Amino acid sequence: MTERFDLALLKGRLLPDAPVELQRLPVASVAVVVNPEDRGGSILLIRRTERSGDPWSGQIGFPGGHKSPEDQGLLQTAIRETREEVGIILDRHELLGALPMVTTHSRRVQVAPFVFALKSDVAMQMNREVTETFWVPLSELNRLDVKSREVKVEEGRLEVDSFDYGGRIIWGLTFRILNLLLGRGLEGHV
């Protein structure tokens, strides 16, 4: 029998409110969705559709995107983008808190990660921006080897730290957010 993930432990180690924005950069937010019932706690990741001109084309990430003028705040951005991209209505689930603001490697966008726990099973409905959804058990993230690799970015090529999860390369913003999550003391929990 698999243990249930300890949501109270995670909630106690997150920021209770949205992280502080730097006024000089555009903002976006993502939803770090935890399924506490799946293999002792799993995280939802997506593969973005490959599109010309999209700097995140084909990359592994979290549901999320840029803040729209109609969004009341970054939390609403994460909720809206998750509903649009994968069909999960986060209002029906539990907001655990936030992680600190993360800036993209190009320093063009700052991203607020909000952490949610599912209260029930969900059926994914991907839109055109997403080609794949998958769950990564936290216990497996703790065992993945961090490797340096060269990736193609808008500016050319960049040497980055990354995880390889079943042939899916997790690097950049997603890699840093996952490390922030694991750095909340969860590595000893799973």
Q: Where is each model-derived feature located?
A:
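Amphipathic alpha-helical blocks and their helix-capping loop/short-beta junctions
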Residues: 126, 130, 135-157
